């Protein structure tokens, strides 16, 4: 049997609180194999001041039986004391303790799992940095933090396919937990996750910022290049196959994106987005049925339906777009349906032709991730397929690049795709630089009527809204408020 040995040992002092669980030994072993010095204490055999006197670099709360309120000993007090001082990580009950400490509810998870593996999706940060999507993780639990009681200071970082929370992280402090067992031999990439724990330092995430070269956009782009390359090799899905299908007339009729948006009599147009999750927010509505959501938007007066088709971080698919187009064709006359936008990280003609065949009227081109020659090539190719793209920018320089290629519909993303921080002034600062014949759409961060009203007064033509609409209890009212 091979033993894992770290190539570059991480010399950290870890205090491991044992909640009377046999898996504590596995956690200890994994930490030691990465080079850490580990001190283990039962949850009733040491005090918080005594732990503080040890001056640990990292605190780790182990798995354990029972409920965090009654069976975790000093674990919750440790989380309260060390939050903001050093990194605090929790496994299984350790995560449940975090949920409880910050005001959440730990309850029956809806299923009892013992030694079973489940694939998860995650946000690629913290413990999940550089961990592939869809890995199998080992679960031993019947309790979990409930999504409805998620504390405002925490964000969901990982979940199962049926929506059970598998990871949470404090938005400010280096406090993070997972419901599964990274130290189990059945968990994929467990050693990498333990190593990621040891690589975190200090009391805040601000102190652990990733360099731009490892930004979220870079990771998504790299993953999508792999995905597209693999799919384009499958018989029946090659570029030549797609081209043959297009030449046979299999692409459905389309509407002119620019004409639909510019001919609206509303004060502003709404591009309503089908969005199950995001890297910044984690799961939003994993059980959403794309066609149902799109129909709600269309009946409420949306001018376009944006369909996220990226599978790893946003939990979308091209089939979602196909289904959205089908339901719109069934429920609306050809000239009265909303346009369909493929919201994707596009870098190749393959993705554009794929979108056209699936029923998209337009595609998103992100200036930030494309060289100027490639941007121009993809824009021209889209036009050859009779699609006017939505060209996304985030700065005055990117806006100039978009205008140079002749873009007629420009979206200003208020979210920086490297850091994923939102600044609603990003759109406002570019309004005066937009030519009169170019439509300006504000993207990201629009959550209230006041946000929309400010933009309308500045001359913004419309808004792309995703998360706020996905969470809205009255989609029709919300869209009406945005438009009028």
UniProtKB/Swiss-Prot annotation:
Binding site for L-glutamine: 64-66, 96, 142-143
Ranges in a coiled coil: none
Keywords, in A-Z order: Amino-acid biosynthesis, Aromatic amino acid biosynthesis, Glutamine amidotransferase, Lyase, Multifunctional enzyme, Phosphoprotein, Tryptophan biosynthesis
Catalyzed chemical reaction(s): chorismate + L-glutamine = anthranilate + pyruvate + L-glutamate + H(+); 1-(2-carboxyphenylamino)-1-deoxy-D-ribulose 5-phosphate + H(+) = (1S,2R)-1-C-(indol-3-yl)glycerol 3-phosphate + CO2 + H2O
Pathway: Amino-acid biosynthesis; L-tryptophan biosynthesis; L-tryptophan from chorismate: step 1/5; Amino-acid biosynthesis; L-tryptophan biosynthesis; L-tryptophan from chorismate: step 4/5
Segments of this protein annotated with the region Indole-3-glycerol phosphate synthase: 215-484
EC number(s) given by UniProt: 4.1.3.27, 4.1.1.48
Any single GO CC term annotated in Swiss-Prot or TrEMBL for this entry: cytoplasm
GO biological process, one term: L-tryptophan biosynthetic process
InterPro entries, sorted: Aldolase_TIM, Anth_synth/Amidotransfase, Class_I_gatase-like, GATASE, Indole-3-glycerol_P_synth_dom, Indole-3-GlycerolPSynthase_CS, RibuloseP-bd_barrel, TrpG/PapA_dom
Modification sites for Phosphoserine: 2
Residue ranges of every copy of the Glutamine amidotransferase type-1 domain listed in the record: 13-207
Active site (record annotation): 92 (nucleophile), 181 (for gatase activity), 183 (for gatase activity)
GO MF, any single term: indole-3-glycerol-phosphate synthase activity
Induction details: By tryptophan starvation.
Superkingdom of the organism of origin: Eukaryota
NCBIfam families for the chain: trpG_papA (TIGR00566)
Subunit structure: Tetramer of two components I and two components II.
Miscellaneous: Component I catalyzes the formation of anthranilate using ammonia rather than glutamine, whereas component II provides glutamine amidotransferase activity.
The protein's name in its UniProt record: Multifunctional tryptophan biosynthesis protein
Species: Saccharomyces cerevisiae (strain ATCC 204508 / S288c)
Gene name of the encoded protein: TRP3
């Amino acid at each position: 049997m091979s033993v894992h040995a770290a190539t570059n040992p991480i010399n950290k002092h870890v205090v491991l609180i044992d909640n009377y669980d046999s898996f504590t030994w596995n956690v200890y072993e994994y930490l030691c194999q990465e080079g850490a010095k580990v001190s283990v204490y039962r949850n009733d055999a040491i005090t918080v001041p005594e732990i503080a006197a040890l001056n640990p670099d990292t605190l780790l709360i182990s798995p354990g039986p029972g409920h965090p309120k009654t069976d975790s000993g000093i674990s919750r007090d440790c989380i309260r004391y060390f939050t903001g001082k050093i990194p605090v990580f929790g496994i299984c009950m350790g995560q449940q303790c975090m949920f409880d400490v910050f005001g959440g509810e730990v309850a029956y998870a809806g299923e009892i799992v013992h030694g079973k593996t489940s694939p998860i999706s995650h946000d690629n940060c913290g413990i999940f940095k550089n961990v592939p999507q869809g890995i199998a993780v080992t679960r031993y639990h019947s309790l979990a933090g409930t999504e409805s009681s998620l504390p405002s200071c925490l964000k969901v970082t990982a979940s199962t396919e049926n929506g059970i929370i598998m990871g949470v992280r404090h938005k400010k402090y280096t406090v993070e937990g997972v419901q599964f067992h990274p130290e189990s031999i059945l968990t994929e990439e467990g050693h990498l996750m333990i190593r990621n724990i040891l690589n975190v330092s200090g009391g805040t995430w601000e102190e652990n910022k990733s360099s731009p070269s490892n930004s979220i956009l870079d990771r998504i782009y790299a993953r999508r290049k792999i995905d597209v390359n693999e799919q384009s090799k499958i018989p029946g899905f090659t570029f030549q196959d797609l081209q043959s299908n297009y030449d046979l007339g299999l692409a459905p009729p389309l509407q002119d994106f620019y004409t639909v948006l510019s001919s609206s009599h509303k004060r502003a147009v709404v591009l309503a987005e089908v969005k199950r999750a995001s890297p910044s927010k984690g799961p939003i509505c994993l059980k959403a049925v794309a066609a149902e959501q799109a129909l709600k938007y269309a009946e409420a007066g949306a001018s376009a339906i944006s369909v996220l088709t990226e599978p790893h971080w946003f939990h979308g698919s091209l089939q979602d777009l196909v289904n959205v187009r089908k339901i719109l064709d069934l429920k609306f006359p050809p000239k009265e349906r909303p346009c369909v936008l493929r919201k994707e990280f596009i870098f190749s003609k393959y993705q554009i032709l794929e979108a056209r065949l699936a029923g998209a009227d337009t595609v998103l081109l992100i200036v930030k991730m494309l060289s100027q020659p490639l941007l121009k090539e993809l824009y021209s190719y889209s036009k050859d397929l009779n699609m006017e793209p939505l060209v996304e920018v985030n700065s005055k320089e990117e806006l100039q690049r978009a205008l140079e290629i002749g873009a007629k519909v420009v979206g200003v993303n208020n979210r920086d795709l490297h850091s994923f921080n939102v600044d609603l002034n990003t759109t406002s600062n570019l309004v005066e630089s937009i030519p009169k014949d170019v439509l300006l759409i504000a993207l990201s961060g629009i959550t209230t009527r006041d946000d929309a009203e400010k933009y309308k007064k500045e001359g913004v033509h419309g808004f792309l809204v995703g998360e706020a609409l996905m969470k809205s209890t009255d989609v029709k009212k919300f869209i009406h408020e945005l438009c009028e």
